[in-house]
């Protein structure tokens, strides 16, 4: 592992431990050349995914880009970062285990929206507004109407 401080390849692992859901290994490292300490995270990659963009271009799947877009939708929301990490890991696992090496950006977007809907309504609406390219207030009203209808249906089930 290359040191982010001095670019030396001579680093040493001082501590390794799994995260809470055991999907990632956290490693504390130290650079032998400059004594800089840093942390790395390792996760299993089941397959190399290719994303088919709306314009037809094919690009490598970028987990960090997915995480950034989810974090933007969750900005200033009271959601534990560990739950966000678990959600993104679950989305990636679903995509990797889907059997296809190439997946559409629409498939990814729909998966993110499904997971965000369960995690935080505000983040779901924020993500949907960008993903579905909302242009007018009625676009927001339609999504909010869907959410309130789902809430009413859930409440009716609880009362039974």
From Swiss-Prot:
Which PROSITE patterns does the record associate with it?
ATP_CONE
Annotated region Disordered: the residues are 1-20
Which UniProt keywords are listed?
Answer: ATP-binding, DNA-binding, Metal-binding, Nucleotide-binding, Repressor, Transcription, Transcription regulation, Zinc, Zinc-finger
Which stretches make up the ATP-cone domain?
A: 49-139
Gene Ontology biological process terms in this record: negative regulation of DNA-templated transcription
**Cofactor: record remark:** Binds 1 zinc ion.
Top-level taxon: Bacteria
Renumbered to this chain, the Polar residues biased-composition regions fall at 1-11
Q: Which GO terms describe its molecular function?
A: ATP binding; DNA binding; zinc ion binding
Q: Which family does it belong to?
A: Belongs to the NrdR family.
Its biological purpose: Negatively regulates transcription of bacterial ribonucleotide reductase nrd genes and operons by binding to NrdR-boxes.
Q: What is this protein called?
A: Transcriptional repressor NrdR
Origin species, per record, is Rhodopseudomonas palustris (strain TIE-1)
Its gene is nrdR
């Amino acid at each position: 592992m290359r040191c982010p401080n001095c670019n030396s390849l001579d680093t040493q692992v001082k501590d390794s431990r799994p995260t809470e859901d055991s999907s990632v290994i956290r490693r504390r490292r130290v650079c032998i050349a400059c004594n800089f300490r840093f942390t790395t995270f390792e996760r299993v990659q089941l397959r190399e995914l290719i994303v088919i963009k709306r314009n037809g271009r094919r690009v490598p799947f970028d987990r960090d880009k997915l995480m950034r877009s989810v974090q933007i939708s969750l900005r200033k929301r009271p959601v534990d970062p560990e739950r966000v990490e678990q959600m993104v890991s679950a989305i990636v696992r679903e995509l990797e285990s889907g059997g296809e090496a190439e997946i559409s950006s629409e498939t990814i977007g729909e998966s993110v929206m499904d997971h965000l809907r369960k995690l935080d309504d505000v983040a779901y609406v924020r993500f949907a507004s960008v993903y579905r390219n909302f242009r007018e207030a009625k676009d927001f009203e339609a999504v909010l109407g869907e959410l309130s209808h789902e809430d009413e249906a859930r409440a009716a089930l609880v009362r039974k």
